[in-house]
Amino acid sequence: MRFLIGALLTLQTLVQASSMSSMPNSYPVPEAPAEGGFRSVVYFVNWAIYGRGHNPQDLKADQFTHILYAFANIRPSGEVYLSDTWADTDKHYPGDKWDEPGKNVYGCTKQMYLLKKNNRNLKTLLSIGGWTYSPNFKTPASTEEGRKKFADTSLKLMKDLGFDGIDIDWEYPEDEKQANDFVLLLKACREALDAYSAKHPNGKKFLLTIASPAGPQNYNKLKLAEMDKYLDFWNLMAYDFSGSWDKVSGHMSNVFPSTTKPESTPFSSDKAVKDYIKAGVPANKIVLGMPLYGRAFASTDGIGTSFNGVGGGSWENGVWDYKDMPQQGAQVTELEDIAASYSYDKNKRYLISYDTVKIAGKKAEYITKNGMGGGMWWESSSDKTGNESLVGTVVNGLGGTGKLEQRENELSYPESVYDNLKNGMPS
């Protein structure tokens, strides 16, 4: 899930935001956070358990209000299905029994449920799509039958696996028809979730969120106000502003545009946030996405200059985990006026744009000052620990864990096909 918003940038005039048509307001109004009740959201990817050696048990769960478990895939019929059943439901972790009677679930989803049992303020959502699977949205979203299949099967996975909702990551609707289809897809999902909530013993509301674009060439195509009626909050992907697809090196997650080197900031978080609010999305429903990684530029003379290649990376070329930063021999530059930072090795002529602890603190200030809904991170395996943790820095900047949203999760799933989950994962 690397959100290449810059890859689609053209020299054409950006499409203006679509007009908002009226829709019935018969759906529950999403819960606004209490004063100071910030959301702390992180993506956990199911492939992290392999080379990265990162498992759900490694999460510092008390720092988060929501974990988005990524990713489920979509069939042309609209059926939502798990993308890696061994990681998702089959892998046995220490303490999992091989001779447990009945039909039982294991893997990462069991571990997510156990995290919820130990931290009743932690919610988990099944995230569907992502960059790789996003082309699979178009066909099922275009028909009522496909949308119903999507809503019904994502709801079933939520009930079977013990999630508190679903997160949709469609990158990105390409035209007005697909934008309309997205609204209708969210409507179908909201109706399915609310129908289940109405008959659920506890009657709790189940959540619906999306990963939303920060590039105007993408969000100007969306019907933001109409979508907002069905969403609990928006995870704004305010990163990947610059990368290998550009002609000059740039900041990949700056809050404000640079006035001294505008070519280094083709996008900014602040513009996206203001445009969303102008379109009708409440600030307290916008969760600011932040990267736990950096993007690299090789053979460059500095920020905003030409480059040639991206060099190596932690797991893919040109992308470095935050915990691998800064590299030996590189000098770190922090630009507080635009809330951006980077490292540069003048001998190797190698630049990496990433967030430092100081810049994470500036982003926490921005979230607070603008009354936003909290912070989100991609992805959980890449952070440092202790005082160097970007997540911890932002959470502390928002006032600490006591200022996070207080909303109890759901542990009762009487319709689950898995006996151990249906019984609350007895020890």
From Swiss-Prot:
Site note Transition state stabilizer, residues: D169
Span of the signal peptide: 1-17
GO cellular component annotations of the record: extracellular region
Binding, chitin: G102, K103, G129, G130, W131, T132, Y172, M237, A238, Y239, D240, W378
GO molecular function per UniProt: chitin binding; endochitinase activity
Leading EC class: hydrolase
Entry's EC annotation: 3.2.1.14
SUPFAM superfamilies xref list: (Trans)glycosidases, Chitinase insertion domain
Active-site annotation: E171
GH18 domain sequence ranges: 38-401
Keywords on record: Carbohydrate metabolism, Chitin degradation, Chitin-binding, Glycoprotein, Glycosidase, Hydrolase, Polysaccharide degradation, Signal
Catalyses which reaction(s): Random endo-hydrolysis of N-acetyl-beta-D-glucosaminide (1->4)-beta-linkages in chitin and chitodextrins
UniProt cross-references to Pfam families, sorted A to Z: Glyco_hydro_18
Entry similarity comment: Belongs to the glycosyl hydrolase 18 family. Chitinase class V subfamily.
Protein name per Swiss-Prot or TrEMBL: Endochitinase 1
Gene for this chain: CTS1
